[in-house]
């Protein structure tokens, strides 16, 4: 096999399709939201979702100490939210970076403008080098807007 540069690996792996979502996290009075793209469902029974989180991030620190986190997905028309959460978030009562949130019974933030959200209980943490893969079991989820509304915004 030939030597592959880090640049070639980065350019190539960026072509793997990935959804964008916001991970909501909380521990001991500190809240955060973080844009994430390494997201996948890993099991139907139990219902598990996995997310890759940078080991140097605030979100990693919070998720590593807490048993719960959220995954929030947004309309393709509402992309500004992802820019707002590329750096640590500022929390004020009912808001993260001025985005309205509601806290679950486990005190993790769900984003009021999300088209679907999942509350997850961490079942496994797998350190894979620069990132840790958190696997969580779905303990609650909701699609606040109608499926018809979502379909109307899809492009073929």
Residue locations for each model-derived region?
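N-terminal structural module
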Residues: 1-73, 140
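Beta-strand-rich interaction surfaces with strong enrichment in secreted/lumenal proteins
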Residues: 106-109
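Short, conserved beta-turn/loop elements at beta-strand boundaries and strand-helix junctions
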Residues: 126-130, 143-145
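Glycine-rich, pocket-lining loop/helix-strand segments that form or immediately flank
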Residues: 56-103
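Hydrophobic core residues within well-ordered beta-strands of beta-rich domains
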Residues: 116-118, 132
